[in-house]
């Protein structure tokens, strides 16, 4: 998650930092046979991003699309009301969805050769145990 660094603050990354974050997933992606759905905060560069630094997308996400060819990439950050942008577009067989504000879509349940269905390979947040709850 996160967006392009445009001023000091949390959850902002340079493109090199985002590329390293994606690289950390390389072996998991290989072991799992790829990825079907990618969910990000910011869009890929040139594919639904904005003209100002605060809304630029990541080139490293374009590289991810070109390498792994997921079925979907769902992003936010660039609101539709900021200008005439497509909510849904295609990039080399990947459906890109700008899900800002809200967007409902259905994903067909179908097997894909070489991929294991129903497995999560990366979780960013886990519930932390409250030490006070253990002693109640």
Model regions: which residues?
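Catalytic metal-binding/acid-base residues of hydrolase active sites
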Residues: 4-5, 43-45, 77-81, 102
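Short, hydrophobic beta-strand segments that form beta-sheet elements in well-ordered domains
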Residues: 38, 73-75
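Binuclear metal-dependent phosphoesterase catalytic core
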Residues: 63-68, 72, 81-136
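Conserved catalytic scaffold of divalent metal-dependent phosphoesterases
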Residues: 1-56, 60, 125
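Short glycine-rich loop/turn motifs that provide flexible caps or phosphate-binding loops at active sites
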Residues: 1, 75, 92
